């Protein structure tokens, strides 16, 4: 049976999840700015709970962004360190997709407009549709001002709004059937998406793991 570890530090939440012997174990905490100190102990505790060592892992899934730049870098650094040492592949997963998958799990919704507050008066935005239990991207993930967010051109039916970007709901033209602006990515849902990717043969070598920031400029431009 496949044994997968999933971890995410891209937002205020820090979470890990483990699939072993067909069972899922998770640990989730909202601990802003403590991810670097907490992540490895959380992984160690989860493995101990399952009674296995790191060598039992087949692959490691992680939140590749978009999200907080420091948080995304923490995940990449830890994943590459573990994967190099173990000679195991990795599974990069979009944090917007993880939000959509969580909305499916908790709310039973099949169409989700996922949005993460990107600061600088922008949101990370992606629209997802359920297919055989997996939330799949429709269109592209983007970073944009809330008022520019839109559903896919072929959109119909009801859409659910998930993520902190919906704190800008009054500026978003899309009117969802329901929303949860407090929802953060959870490694349990990252694990689900990572397992789908694993079974499709989409694992990559750790060296190829790259963050997806969506935004190139992270600092306020200097005056000329």
Question: Predicted segment positions?
Answer:
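SAM-dependent methyltransferases
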Residues: 1, 200-204, 215, 220-224
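N-terminal beta-alpha supersecondary unit
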Residues: 1-64
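Surface "functional belts" at beta-alpha junctions
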Residues: 34, 89-185, 213, 218-219, ...
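Stable alpha-helical structural segments in soluble proteins, enriched in small hydrophobic residues
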Residues: 46-50, 85, 103, 187-198
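Phosphate-handling active-site elements
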Residues: 48-55, 83-93, 107
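DPxDG-like acidic metal-binding loop motif
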Residues: 61-90, 95
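Glycine-rich phosphate-binding/hydrolytic loop that grips phosphoryl groups
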Residues: 180-212
